Regions:
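Hydrophobic alpha-helical transmembrane segments
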Residues: 42-43, 68-73, 112-116, 168-173
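Short helix-perturbing small/polar motifs within transmembrane alpha-helices
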Residues: 141-183
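Alpha-helical membrane segments and adjacent membrane-interface helices in multi-pass membrane proteins
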Residues: 82-145
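Membrane-helix interfacial "entry" motifs
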Residues: 4, 30-37, 59, 63, ...
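Membrane-water interface at transmembrane helix exits
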Residues: 53-60, 86, 122, 126, ...
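Hydrophobic transmembrane alpha-helices
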Residues: 23-101
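Aromatic-anchored segments of alpha-helical transmembrane domains
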Residues: 19-26, 77-83, 119-126, 175-184
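N-terminal membrane topogenic signal
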Residues: 1-16, 36-41
């Protein structure tokens, strides 16, 4: 069911997120309702909408019925991993997002859709981030993180073997920089 590349990436999943949680010094914060003006929320929604359209087009073009469960698995993984908050100094918490790993496995376009699904469910059912701020939260965590993480992963790992430790370092760097940039 999984390709050799996907299997190799999943092999490093536990190590990657263990290291990521230990070294996380920034927070991917959900923006609540009332923090942004309605005009800003609308603009952020307009900014994220083209990325959703690109992701949906990519899913339609490249995914088949056999691979659709992978998107659901990545969305569920992102949803679950965002529920584990790590206390940070200053009275706030941080959490892993799962967007970097999703981008490495299926590409940043499809990862945007998977993470957006998780964020929308969290906003509507758990109050984690505001409903009006869905565009801003999806832009910060479902667009910025996957695209930056994927670019860094590709630049650092280049054509190394799938079981190379360089790929683990590339995944860590991509995830860490992606979360850091997404937090700003």
């Amino acid at each position: 069911m999984f390709t050799k590349k996907t299997h190799g990436v999943l092999k490093w999943l536990g190590i990657y997120y263990s290291v990521m949680l230990l070294w996380m010094i920034t927070t991917a914060m959900h923006i609540p309702d009332g923090y942004l003006s309605p005009a800003t929320s609308f603009v952020m929604f307009l900014l994220v909408f083209p990325f959703w359209a690109i992701g949906i087009r990519k899913i339609r073009a490249t995914m088949n019925a056999r691979n659709v469960p992978l998107i659901a698995l990545l969305a569920a993984f992102s949803f679950v991993i965002m529920m584990f908050n790590v206390p940070l100094p200053g009275g706030t918490t941080g959490h892993a997002v799962g967007a970097a790993l999703a981008a490495i496995i299926v590409g940043p376009e499809i990862a945007t859709i998977a993470v957006s699904i998780a964020l929308i469910i969290q906003a509507f059912f758990f109050g984690d981030g505001g409903v009006l701020a869905i565009g801003a939260n999806c832009f910060n965590m479902a667009v910025v993180i996957p695209y930056i993480a994927y670019a860094i992963y590709q630049a650092v790992s280049k054509n190394t073997p799938i079981n190379s430790s360089r790929r683990l370092v590339a995944a860590f760097l991509g995830g860490w920089v992606g979360v850091t940039v997404g937090a700003f």
